[in-house]
């Protein structure tokens, strides 16, 4: 009996110890995760804020827009006291952009080509803005171009010819397009005088005899503006004379043609035929090739000059030579009209070439560009021709044209 009681007590004690251990283990197991969770919350890495989709592009666009605004600010025709600083700021903003950001530049006038297009080596040009001018100055006035190679070949080519022919005269340069002056200054750090700057420079250097030789094609609106600028300075010099533009006097109608237009017609045609690889204009005609010389066009009364040039081509027997204009003024020089005339003549090959002193923006883009509204693209899209080629060369680089300017200058110096 006593033994049974001992066994029973031992069993109860073992059960109690088991229950006590199980309770202790359960409490400990529940407490460990709770203890571990506290430090986990303290050391957890903060989540990164989500970047809105497109925010990086927006930042790039903002920088591109800033550069575009600075470019638009210097795309103006008036020079101010802030112009030099604005040109520098526009270039600095462009240089700070990445290549990807530069492709986003788009303003009223600004685009990636403003600073990004390679137009040649500006260091080959001479702005001819030096002081130390002698008593006799020959000021060569051009509209201007931002295409470096064309500026050197066409404008500098004329200036060099005039300087060689007039060694006793100081040859200087002026552009009438401030927009172009700003472009060249901002991009290439080349400073070219506008008309006011050039005339002020001449007066400040004690010039007595001033001869102005415009490189303009005709007596158009730009020539009129040049005359107004010169007249305002006439009392600053002992004598002021202005030579004829390339095509000379305008004349009264399309049938009245002067010797200058004949000389230009012969010179540009001969150069175009040679560059196209033909021995003569007749050889080109037999090959079914026509030449289209493209001018700017104008609403000015001087637009009759283009009609006179077409008449002159006919008088010379140049049946496969046609005159067109970018602006389509006069009407018969519009692209559609010229295309029809070329097609009706039975010509299947077309060679486009500028009837412009400088092969600049109009020649490179409006005439020979890849856009659908360029003359080359429209002639090609018409399907009327087997081939359409473009010769990008200004009149100013043709020796016979340079000689004509020299003759015009000599005429007023006599």
Feature roles, as predicted:
Residues 1-9:
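Bacterial N-terminal signal peptides that target proteins for export
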Residues 17-21:
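C-terminal motif of bacterial Sec signal peptides marking the signal peptidase cleavage site
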Residues 23-26:
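Bacterial signal peptide processing site
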Residues 28-58:
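Low-complexity, Pro/Thr/Ser/Glu-rich flexible segments characteristic
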Residues 54-119:
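Beta-rich interaction/scaffold domains
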Residues 57, 111-414:
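Extended amphipathic ligand-handling, pore-lining, and cofactor/metal-binding catalytic surfaces
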């Amino acid at each position: 009996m006593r033994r049974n009681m001992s066994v029973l007590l031992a069993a109860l004690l073992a059960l109690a110890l088991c229950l006590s251990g199980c309770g202790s283990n359960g409490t400990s197991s529940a407490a460990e995760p709770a203890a571990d969770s506290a430090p986990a919350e303290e050391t957890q890495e903060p989540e990164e804020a989500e970047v809105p989709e497109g925010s990086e592009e927006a930042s790039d666009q903002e920088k591109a827009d800033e550069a575009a605004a600075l470019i638009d600010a210097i795309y103006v025709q008036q020079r101010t006291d802030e112009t030099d600083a604005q040109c520098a700021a526009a270039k600095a903003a462009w240089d700070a952009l990445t290549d990807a950001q530069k492709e986003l530049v788009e303003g009223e006038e600004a685009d990636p080509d403003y600073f990004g297009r390679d137009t040649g080596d500006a260091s080959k040009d001479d702005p001819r803005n030096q002081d130390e001018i002698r008593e006799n100055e020959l000021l060569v006035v051009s509209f201007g171009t931002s295409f470096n190679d064309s500026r050197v070949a066409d404008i500098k080519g004329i200036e060099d010819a005039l300087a060689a022919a007039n060694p006793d005269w100081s040859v200087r340069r002026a552009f009438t397009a401030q927009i172009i002056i700003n472009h060249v200054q901002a991009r290439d750090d080349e400073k070219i005088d506008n008309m006011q700057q050039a005339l002020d420079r001449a007066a400040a250097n004690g010039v007595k005899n001033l001869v102005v030789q415009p490189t303009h094609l005709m007596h158009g609106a730009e020539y009129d503006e040049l005359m107004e600028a010169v007249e305002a300075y006439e009392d600053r010099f002992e004598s002021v004379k202005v030579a004829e533009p390339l095509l000379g006097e305008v004349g009264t109608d399309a049938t009245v043609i002067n010797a200058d237009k004949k000389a230009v017609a012969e010179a540009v045609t001969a150069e175009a035929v040679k560059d196209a690889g033909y021995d003569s204009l007749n050889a080109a005609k037999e090959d079914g090739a026509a030449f289209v010389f493209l001018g700017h066009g104008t609403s000015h009364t001087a637009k009759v000059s283009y009609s006179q040039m077409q008449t002159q081509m006919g008088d010379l027997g140049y049946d496969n030579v046609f005159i067109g204009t970018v602006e389509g003024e006069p009407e018969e020089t519009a692209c559609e009209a010229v295309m029809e005339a070329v097609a009706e003549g039975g010509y299947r090959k077309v060679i486009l070439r500028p009837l412009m002193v400088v092969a600049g923006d109009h020649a490179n883009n409006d005439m020979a560009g890849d856009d659908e509204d360029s003359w080359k693209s429209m002639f090609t899209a018409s399907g009327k021709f087997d081939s359409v080629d473009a010769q990008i060369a200004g009149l100013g680089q043709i020796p016979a044209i340079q000689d004509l300017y020299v003759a015009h200058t000599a005429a007023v110096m006599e």
